[in-house]
Amino acid sequence: MIAHASTQNGLRRAQMPQPEYRALAARLVGRGFAVLVPERPGHGATGGKYLEDQGGCDEADYARSGRVTADEISAAAGHLRKQSFIRPDGIVVVGHSAGAWGALALASEDPRNVAAIIAFAPGRGGHANDLPNRICAADTLVAAAAEFGSGARVKVTWLVAENDSYFSPAFSRGMADAFRSTGGKADFRVLPAYGREGHWLAETEGGVNLAGPELDGALKSRSARPANKR
């Protein structure tokens, strides 16, 4: 299941097209996965209340925001798991940006429900005031990553492009270290620079190809887990 990026800007959220991640979905389908890309509440055609609001810089609550996103991902995964063509213990969550932040919060899920998590540039509050390399309440974000690591049971493959101006490799490594410091398991990888802005790598064919070896490694690691007997 692919969990999309988000924005605090209400107008941009309302105008958001249905997330597709075509190249990423195609790669997953080519490796035997069924793929679901649900649009979460408060975005585009789904509409409704924006439940994962993080608040302003002064009162940013990234932990709460991530957990709400995780709940939304979990609800969609629960629907997917009920389908007859799905291996219920083999679900992989691939998150991007805010969706990846929610996936980190989901790492405390039972591994029998979520087999692996792949997180492209997880975080929230990047590009504060629309300025590159500025993060709203950065210390709060790192502290929330540490909070997610406590009790985490699912391994995370954490990917960030060299030229990501939302969550730079140096800052992302600090978050990954915080996540691991409290017990979380994360394989942190820096991908080569891609295009003008590496944060959107997961949305393009070239970017997905660039991340291909890391993606395949994470998927093979999941596939190596023994299936539950039925």
Q: What does each model-found stretch correspond to?
A:
Residues 1-5, 160:
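The conserved beta1-alpha1 loop
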Residues 3-4, 38-40, 120, 191:
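Alpha/beta-hydrolase
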Residues 6-45, 168:
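Short substrate-entry loop that stabilizes the transition state in hydrolases
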Residues 39-58:
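Glycine-rich "HGGG/HGxG" loop immediately N-terminal to the catalytic nucleophile
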Residues 55-84:
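Alpha/beta-hydrolase active-site loop
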Residues 75-140, 147:
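Primarily recognizes the serine-hydrolase "nucleophile elbow" in alpha/beta-hydrolase
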Residues 116, 122-182, 187:
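The feature captures the conserved acid-bearing segment of alpha/beta-hydrolase catalytic domains
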Residues 182-230:
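C-terminal catalytic histidine-bearing segment of alpha/beta-hydrolase fold enzymes
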